[in-house]
Amino acid sequence: MGVVRAARQVGLPVAISFTVETDGHLPDGTPLASAIQQVDADDGGPDWYLVNCAHPTHIEPGLTGHGGWRERIAGLLPNASTLTHAELDAAEELDEGDPAELAAACDRLRPLLPSLSIVGGCCGTDARHVAALWGVPGPG
């Protein structure tokens, strides 16, 4: 990937983030493991991978299998909603989901992602969701 090569040329750390559909595969059908392994093989890989713009219940099915590829994922930036990307694109109102449910779903992924150190939010999230993800009191 060009971004990895460019960052390496100037000595910058670099991360690549993938999104997944409800089955844990990339939108083109590529399994998450295969995508990470392919980028690592082609370019030596970024310093970190993240998964973003998908609810944790959509990410979880993609975290199966063996190998060190799951250790390469350092971050999750999940959507608040459990709706599919197509449903979100067609929605006329923001689906904010449930902050506690989002946090619980992310917590279930922690044992599968031993390098997880970046947790934030993507579509539909706000300070309430991030507070729940980090287990701190939310705005009030």
Each predicted region: which residue ranges?
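Domain-level signal for soluble alpha/beta catalytic cores
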Residues: 1-140
